[in-house]
């Protein structure tokens, strides 16, 4: 009986802590274009969306790593969005169509290294990573 109570308490605590992961992406009521991540329950992955800067809900993370810690990390390299080498590693760096100034990483096929570039916050291509580690995990292991 004590075992069942413990399981019920732990299950309730876990569900409350991560219940926000089931919320849909919510850009909020303001009009900024801030790149953020939310946990997409349909794909089971953290996905980028544009946040307006105010309002919204708790399924809103500054980095893909924060989203994965809270809601679930991919189990394999191929679980990353854009993990296909041809689309996720071969294209040249693309700053996109917005005017943000975000430091990102891309895989440079000529040098065989992950390098920094400035991302505008929207558009671009899949060769766009939050960190050098993520870039290397996806592109150097293929």
Swiss-Prot record:
Disulfide bonds join 21-71, 30-54, 46-67, 89-139, 98-122, 114-135. InterPro entries: Kunitz_BPTI (IPR002223), Kunitz_BPTI_sf (IPR036880), Prtase_inh_Kunz-CS (IPR020901), TFPI/VKTCI-like (IPR050098). SUPFAM superfamilies: BPTI-like. Its main location: secreted. It holds the Pfam family Kunitz_BPTI. The keyword Signal applies. Residues 1-15 form the signal peptide. Residues 21-71, 89-139 form the BPTI/Kunitz inhibitor domain. Expressed in the midgut. CDD domains: Kunitz_boophilin_1-like, Kunitz_boophilin_2-like. Transmembrane segments: none annotated. It is found in: Secreted. The N-terminus is blocked. One of its GO terms (molecular function) is toxin activity. One of its GO terms (biological process) is envenomation resulting in negative regulation of voltage-gated potassium channel activity in another organism. Gene3D superfamilies: Pancreatic trypsin inhibitor Kunitz domain. The modification Pyrrolidone carboxylic acid is found at residue 16. Keywords: Blood coagulation cascade inhibiting toxin, Disulfide bond, Hemostasis impairing toxin, Protease inhibitor, Pyrrolidone carboxylic acid, Repeat, Secreted, Serine protease inhibitor, Signal, Toxin. GO terms for cellular component: extracellular space. Interacts with host thrombin and trypsin. Midgut thrombin inhibitor that plays a major role in keeping the midgut microenvironment at low hemostatic and inflammatory tonus. Also inhibits FXIa (F11), kallikrein (KLK1), neutrophil elastase (ELANE) and cathepsin G (CTSG), which play a role in the contact pathway of the coagulation cascade. Also abrogates platelet aggregation by cathepsin G and plasmin, and attenuates tissue factor (F3) pathway inhibitor cleavage by elastase. In vivo, inhibits thrombosis and promotes bleeding in mice. This is Boophilin-G2. It comes from Rhipicephalus microplus.
């Amino acid at each position: 009986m004590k075992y069942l109570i413990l399981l019920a308490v732990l299950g309730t605590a876990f569900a409350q802590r991560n219940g926000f992961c089931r919320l849909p992406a919510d850009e909020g009521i303001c009009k900024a274009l801030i790149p953020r991540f939310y946990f997409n329950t349909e794909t089971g992955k953290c996905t980028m969306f544009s946040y307006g800067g105010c309002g919204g809900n708790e399924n809103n993370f500054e980095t893909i790593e924060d989203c994965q810690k809270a809601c679930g990390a991919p189990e394999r390299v191929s679980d990353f969005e854009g993990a296909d080498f041809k689309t996720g590693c071969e294209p040249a760096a693309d700053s996109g169509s917005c005017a943000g100034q975000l430091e990102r990483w891309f895989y440079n096929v000529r040098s065989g290294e992950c390098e920094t570039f400035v991302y505008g916050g929207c558009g671009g291509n899949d060769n766009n990573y939050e960190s050098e580690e993520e870039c290397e995990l996806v592109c150097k292991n293929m």
